[in-house]
């Protein structure tokens, strides 16, 4: 399966691996997703927001090391202060790099107007994970309130497409009670939504979360989750042929060779973290995250 996926990758997107420098600019979040380490109600988290100059330091490093693009990721905020901070930041990155650096955003659910402002400032890709297309699983991953609905998440992906972004999404793999049929439906969702890039990886628990507690004894083995993660990359590559697929940090979190195995199974994007060292260990969406001491 992996060999076939690699052949399809070589034919449709080439053997080249594209690097995106990932900067985790803030772990402040208004959401309360039940699996995530930086959820609003986790009071053990040391919250931070990088300043513009700190972020630009990281951008400079990424640019000087010949990365083609950067990705800005943070917890979700929808206030005007945050929205205009990002808008200004995008413009500054564009100016600094003479528009050479591609800009990917992963900043959660926003209004169509906000997405448009960021697009017009110069961002051209957006990653917003659907997490799972099985509604029962989706609703179990999130609090049942009007801030965490599948409909809004899907609508946001449609807004992004309408505005002109390259649209990225992805799912968590190896969740308790998730079937192979669910995962196949996730891949069909990528096709139906005409998704351009995919970032998906094995689920990893975070002990200070509701699901980290609820699932700690029933989660499938790490080996099985890695295997499922790699199979998902391979089948997605064979089925969708020319999409961009990331070999995610979560794969590496469960297997030291996980990202390399991901590339051999059909992935073509790596997203090394360029977050400031002093903040890396605060942006922990799950336990045992790799790379937090890498400089």
Language-model regions: role of each:
Residues 5, 33, 72, 128, ...:
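Conserved, mostly hydrophobic/aromatic
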Residues 7, 13-54:
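Canonical Radical SAM [4Fe-4S] cluster-binding loop centered on the CxxxCxxC motif
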Residues 21, 56-59, 86-91, 115, ...:
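Generic structural signal for well-ordered alpha-helices
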Residues 20-23, 43-46, 71-83, 141, ...:
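Glycine-rich, proline-tolerant flexible connector loops at the mouths of alpha/beta enzymes
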Residues 1, 7, 63, 191-295:
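Auxiliary Fe-S-binding modules of radical SAM enzymes
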Residues 70, 77-80, 104-106, 110, ...:
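Conserved strand-turn element in the central/C-terminal portion of the radical SAM core barrel
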Residues 111-120, 176-191, 253-264:
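Catalytic cores of alpha/beta
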Residues 40-54, 62-83, 89-90, 94-156, ...:
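Core AdoMet radical
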């Amino acid at each position: 399966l992996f060999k076939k996926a690699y052949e399809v990758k070589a034919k449709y997107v080439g053997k080249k691996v594209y690097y995106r420098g990932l900067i985790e600019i803030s772990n402040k979040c208004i959401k309360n997703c039940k699996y995530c380490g930086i959820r609003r109600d986790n009071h053990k988290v040391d919250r931070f927001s990088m300043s513009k100059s700190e972020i630009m330091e990281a951008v400079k490093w990424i640019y000087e090391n010949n990365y083609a693009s950067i990705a800005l990721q943070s917890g979700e905020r929808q206030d005007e202060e945050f929205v205009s901070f990002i808008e200004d930041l995008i413009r500054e990155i564009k100016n600094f790099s003479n528009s050479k650096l591609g800009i990917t955003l992963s900043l959660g659910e926003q209004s169509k107007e906000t997405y448009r402002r960021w697009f017009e400032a110069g961002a051209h890709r957006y990653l917003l994970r659907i997490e799972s297309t099985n509604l029962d699983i989706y609703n179990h991953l999130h609090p049942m309130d009007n801030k965490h609905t599948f409909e809004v998440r899907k609508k946001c992906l449609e807004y992004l497409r309408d505005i002109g972004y390259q649209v990225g999404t992805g799912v968590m793999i190896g969740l308790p009670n998730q079937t192979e049929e669910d995962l196949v439906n996730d891949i069909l969702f990528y096709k139906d939504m005409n998704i351009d890039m995919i970032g998906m990886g094995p689920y990893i628990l975070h002990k200070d979360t509701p699901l980290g507690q609820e699932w700690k004894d029933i989660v499938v083995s790490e080996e099985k989750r890695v295997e499922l993660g790699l199979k998902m990359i391979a089948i997605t590559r064979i089925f969708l042929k020319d999409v961009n697929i990331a070999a995610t940090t979560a794969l590496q979190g469960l297997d030291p060779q996980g990202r390399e195995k991901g590339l051999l199974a059909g992935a073509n994007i790596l997203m090394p973290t360029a977050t400031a060292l002093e903040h890396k260990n605060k942006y922990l969406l799950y336990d045992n995250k790799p790379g937090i001491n890498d400089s």
